[in-house]
């Protein structure tokens, strides 16, 4: 028996193009997620001119624009950023579920790494914590996952 082949994505960006999709709803949170995503790309060797930011009205619109970006062939990776905060109606459940399913299906359909940086929280405080304060920045975390997956898929 031969040696085992191990594949692992590296955390470097070399000439890769990114599309960052940002929900404008809850922008006081999502703009912080965007800052984290851009910082992550730049700190890992990416150039600001290789980043496209597209703003959509709300999280529900993210899958459609992610599909358009994936279909365009212009990008190596996509990161979806948003904040869905639970209210007193079932709207939260419908939106968070459909956004999650939509983003996952597009990633699979186009063999495209898509980072899921959509916060789904019970409170505004939880969202703020995850947008760069107590619980890190989920925009950064979604982006580092995309960087790793781009490099892993390139090696396959």
UniProtKB/Swiss-Prot annotation:
InterPro entries attached to this UniProt entry: LS, LS/RS, LS/RS_sf
Q: Which Pfam families match?
A: DMRL_synthase
Q: What class of enzyme is it?
A: transferase
EC no. given is 2.5.1.78
Q: Which residues form the signal peptide?
A: none
UniProt catalytic activity = (2S)-2-hydroxy-3-oxobutyl phosphate + 5-amino-6-(D-ribitylamino)uracil = 6,7-dimethyl-8-(1-D-ribityl)lumazine + phosphate + 2 H2O + H(+)
Residues that hold 5-amino-6-(D-ribitylamino)uracil according to the record: 25, 59-61, 83-85, 116
Q: Which GO terms describe its cellular component?
A: cytosol; riboflavin synthase complex
| Stretches assigned to coiled coil | none
Q: Which CDD domains does the annotation name? A: Lumazine_synthase-I
Transmembrane parts of this sequence: none
Pathway(s) this gene product operates in, as recorded in its UniProt entry: Cofactor biosynthesis; riboflavin biosynthesis; riboflavin from 2-hydroxy-3-oxobutyl phosphate and 5-amino-6-(D-ribitylamino)uracil: step 1/2
Tell me which SUPFAM superfamilies the record gives. Lumazine synthase
The biological processes this protein is annotated with in GO are: riboflavin biosynthetic process
Give one GO molecular function term.
6,7-dimethyl-8-ribityllumazine synthase activity
Q: Indicate which residues the UniProt annotation says bind (2S)-2-hydroxy-3-oxobutyl phosphate.
A: 88-89, 130
Q: Where is the active site?
A: 91
Q: Which domain of life is it from?
A: Bacteria
The UniProt keywords, alphabetically, are:
Riboflavin biosynthesis, Transferase
Function of this protein? Catalyzes the formation of 6,7-dimethyl-8-ribityllumazine by condensation of 5-amino-6-(D-ribitylamino)uracil with 3,4-dihydroxy-2-butanone 4-phosphate. This is the penultimate step in the biosynthesis of riboflavin.
Q: Which family does it belong to?
A: Belongs to the DMRL synthase family.
- List the HAMAP family hit by this protein, alphabetically: Lumazine_synth
Protein's name in the database: 6,7-dimethyl-8-ribityllumazine synthase
**Annotated source species:** Magnetococcus marinus (strain ATCC BAA-1437 / JCM 17883 / MC-1)
């Amino acid at each position: 028996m031969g040696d085992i082949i191990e594949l692992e994505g590296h955390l470097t960006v070399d000439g890769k193009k990114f599309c960052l999709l940002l929900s404008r709803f809850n922008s006081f949170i999502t703009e912080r997620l965007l800052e984290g995503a851009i910082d992550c790309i730049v700190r890992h060797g990416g150039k600001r001119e290789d980043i496209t930011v597209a703003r959509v009205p709300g999280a529900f619109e993210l899958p459609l624009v992610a599909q358009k970006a994936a279909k365009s062939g212009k990008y190596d990776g996509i990161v979806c950023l948003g904040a869905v905060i639970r209210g007193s109606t079932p709207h939260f459940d419908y939106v968070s579920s459909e956004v999650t399913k939509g983003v996952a299906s597009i990633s699979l359909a186009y063999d495209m790494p898509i980072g899921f940086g959509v916060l789904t929280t019970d409170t505004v405080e939880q969202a703020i914590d995850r947008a760069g304060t107590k619980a890190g920045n989920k925009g950064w975390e979604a982006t580092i996952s995309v960087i790793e997956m781009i490099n892993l898929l390139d090696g396959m």
